[in-house]
Structure formats: C-alpha cells, structure tokens
Amino acid sequence: MAHNEKRFSLRTSCTSIMLVDDERSRVTRFEFQPDQETGWHEHEYDYVITAITDCDMKIENPDGEDTSVFVNAGDAYRRNTGVKHNVINNGKLPMTFVEIELK
C-alpha cells in the first residue's frame, strides 16, 4: 500500500504485522485499538479482508464522505486495485483483520 495524507488526524496508527510477502501475495495482520487508523493509502493490488474480530469501521474516502461498515468476525470481502481510503476503528473494543493482497 502506498500512503498519502488527505486529511489531518490526531489519531494514532494501528499495528500492522507482515505475515507473507512473496511474488504472488502479501498477507498483513492489522490490529487496532479504539480510534486507531491505518492512515491514508491506495491499494496497489486486488485484496481480500477477513475479520478476525468483529470490526466496527469508519472508512474515510477521498471525496470527503465517510462510510460506516460493520464486518462480523469470520466474514470476508474483496476489493479491486486502486481503492483509496483511511480505515478507523470506530468501535469501543480492539479489532483485528487480515488483508491478503493478490499480486
């Protein structure tokens, strides 16, 4: 992911742990305390997110619109290359998901 700042934020960054990074995929575990964020980034590959815990997320989009998303633990979703956003833990509990990028 390439990061580029869109809006000023006082939030702290989540923890990211690279699990796999090879010629075919990149797998990263993201761990958030409440109100932590990924920071602004653009996805350079198609990707799949699998929620490890329930994930109550606020997604900040480049157009200034925010989207609230709740993903149940164990559920997954897929997105295409080029998505630009900042992901924030909008809940009161820690949240964790695994991102699988397909190179």
Located regions from the model:
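A short, N-terminal "cap"/entry segment at the start of jelly-roll beta-barrel domains
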Residues: 1-29, 33-34, 40, 61, ...
